[in-house]
């Protein structure tokens, strides 16, 4: 049971990192303020579910603060390189400026984690962000996220 809670805390840290990167992108709020809000539970921490035809929010287990901080810090420090990697991975049909903001933030956080964490196996990181993508999208974004994160992992880790 403790292992399951630990996995959930890592999953929620990744989701919170995506939410923080998204909040910064949308509101240009100071990174430190956003991260403090994330660590205090003022940002994220809930999921929208549907039960008996009505939507409701449910609390999520606490995010792992260490992973959350490492991923957001890695994005902050490597944002230009990460965004350039995303740009160069796109096909002619998809431009960087037309990417859905949520999808872009999932890619950013996933790529940042490769900078932040050299210990976790690449397939685990890729799977976590593909699952996050799947929770928001049903289309080609899932395959695109998988391919881009896999390619990026090989560039960063060799």
Place the predicted regions along the sequence by residue.
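N-terminal interaction/assembly modules
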Residues: 1-158
